[in-house]
Amino acid sequence: MMHFKSGLELTELQNMTVPEDDNISNDSNDFTEVENGQINSKFISDRESRRSLTNSHLEKKKCDEYIPGTTSLGMSVFNLSNAIMGSGILGLAFALANTGILLFLVLLTSVTLLSIYSINLLLICSKETGCMVYEKLGEQVFGTTGKFVIFGATSLQNTGAMLSYLFIVKNELPSAIKFLMGKEETFSAWYVDGRVLVVIVTFGIILPLCLLKNLGYLGYTSGFSLSCMVFFLIVVIYKKFQIPCIVPELNSTISANSTNADTCTPKYVTFNSKTVYALPTIAFAFVCHPSVLPIYSELKDRSQKKMQMVSNISFFAMFVMYFLTAIFGYLTFYDNVQSDLLHKYQSKDDILILTVRLAVIVAVILTVPVLFFTVRSSLFELAKKTKFNLCRHTVVTCILLVVINLLVIFIPSMKDIFGVVGVTSANMLIFILPSSLYLKITDQDGDKGTQRIWAALFLGLGVLFSLVSIPLVIYDWACSSSSDEGH
């Protein structure tokens, strides 16, 4: 998940309030009656929130706290696409190989539509409470517990994204260096060891960037990252028509009657021990919810309807891009595809593959500090330590980077990152949190019975996802060797 300018930092959004919606004066179900300039709602408990939804809010010119957005609809679509797009795209071909084309298409379509619905719920909750910060929204509805839960889910999601990015560095940088040195892929030395390289990159490049007080130009690297992923998609499609299907040598995992036709024939529905990773990987690839409200707050002439249009366009574009990457990656390597699709391409004597590999490496290295800023800012905000302190800033940064590096070094495969984060934080952010917030906010609204039923079913789906996927992922770990890619 590549964030829109890291989202905005939480401290920058504290004073943002929700603007007048398209039908704010016509839909009697959207807001409770205004009496003496104050909303009668149990969620409006402090002065800041009361001001955001009172008569003074309805009169934009008199509201000092209202900050009009300046971002066009097109640029907002681009920003949200940046927030959606991330390393998850590299694991989709692996997900397709372990589900089959038809089942994968059903899962991808379902998660796309459900993600759009969850954003709709999130926008309704933001409108009803006047909160434009995800943690603040959780605190308004569920108190301190809600704030901590949302902080935990967003931080785990961002940490998972950072882990996947550094895992790309660990996987891809050695191959790029070997190519530039003119060495074979089998060449071995400490300076082409991915574990050593990821530590060098982290503390030589990423740490200095993370120590900066402000994001600065780093907030705009997501555009470069999205461009790199589009370039990657183009290369994947092009290489499909260049790379022949290769039958692996017979071994203990491949029966003696394997044929070229069997190996190079696409499967439409399939089930195996790795099928469980498909849905978490797809969910991981579509999470952008922490960035939705910051993007909404900067949308010009913003309204719920307009932001919903932004999300619809963005998700449709990402759906097309994800499906094309998955299908062409799968049709290139079939059952031999890995959980990191880029790693399957050999850069030996191939400048194009080297170029896309280097582009992706640079993109993820520059994106890690953006995500890191979000996690650290949320941590300081939660601890009420918003005033800058150089010593604390440095110590927390170093500790977090050390922990992240240890995880990257010892995690055997990207599918493990997608699996864990997908069934936990991605599930929370897409299914459980938006539906829970909506059900709580509309608890006493008898006019929204049908919508509440759908939200309750959505919540149940998220809980079922967790109850089924988490045990299956753990079971696969118990039954598989740490280096098994499932082939």
Swiss-Prot record:
GO molecular function per UniProt: alanine:sodium symporter activity; amino acid transmembrane transporter activity; amino acid:sodium symporter activity; glycine:sodium symporter activity; L-amino acid transmembrane transporter activity; L-glutamine transmembrane transporter activity; neutral L-amino acid transmembrane transporter activity; neutral L-amino acid:sodium symporter activity
Where, in residue ranges, is this chain on the Cytoplasmic side?
1-74, 134-147, 212-216, 297-312, 372-393, 438-452
Major place of localization? membrane
Q: Which residues lie on this side of the membrane: Extracellular?
A: 98-112, 169-188, 238-275, 334-350, 415-416, 474-487
Reaction catalysed by this chain? L-glutamine(in) + Na(+)(in) = L-glutamine(out) + Na(+)(out); L-alanine(in) + Na(+)(in) = L-alanine(out) + Na(+)(out); L-asparagine(in) + Na(+)(in) = L-asparagine(out) + Na(+)(out); L-histidine(in) + Na(+)(in) = L-histidine(out) + Na(+)(out)
Q: Does the keyword DNA damage apply?
A: no
Summarizing activity control, the record says: Inhibited by alpha-(methylamino)isobutyric acid (MeAIB). Inhibited by lithium, potassium, choline ions, N-methylglucamine. The pH dependence has an allosteric effect on the transport.
Reply yes or no: does the keyword Heme apply: no
Taken from the UniProt entry, a GO cellular component term is: external side of apical plasma membrane
Biological process annotations from GO: amino acid import; amino acid transmembrane transport; amino acid transport; female pregnancy; gamma-aminobutyric acid biosynthetic process; glutamine transport; L-alpha-amino acid transmembrane transport; L-glutamine import across plasma membrane
Localization annotation: Cell membrane
- Which residue ranges traverse the bilayer? 75-97, 113-133, 148-168, 189-211, 217-237, 276-296, 313-333, 351-371, 394-414, 417-437, 453-473
The recorded induction information for this protein reads:
Down-regulated by bacterial lipopolysaccharides (LPS) in glial cells. Down-regulated upon hypoxia.
State which tissues express it: Expressed in the cerebral cortex by pyramidal and GABAergic neurons, astrocytes and other non-neuronal cells (at protein level). Expressed in placenta, heart, lung, skeletal muscle, spleen, stomach and testis. Highly expressed in cytotrophoblast cells from term placenta.
Glycosylation: which residues?
N251, N257
Q: Which residues carry this modification: Phosphothreonine?
A: T11, T54
Q: How is it modified after translation?
A: N-glycosylation plays an important role in the L-glutamine transport.
Q: Which residues carry this modification: Phosphoserine?
A: S6, S25, S28, S49, S52, S56
Report the SS bond pairs: C245-C264
Taxonomy, superkingdom? Eukaryota
Q: What does this protein do?
A: Symporter that cotransports short-chain neutral amino acids and sodium ions from the extraccellular to the intracellular side of the cell membrane. The transport is elctrogenic, pH dependent and driven by the Na(+) electrochemical gradient. Participates in the astroglia-derived glutamine transport into GABAergic interneurons for neurotransmitter GABA de novo synthesis. May also contributes to amino acid transport in placental trophoblasts. Also regulates synaptic plasticity.
Family label: Belongs to the amino acid/polyamine transporter 2 family.
Q: What is this protein called?
A: Sodium-coupled neutral amino acid symporter 1
| Natural source organism | Homo sapiens
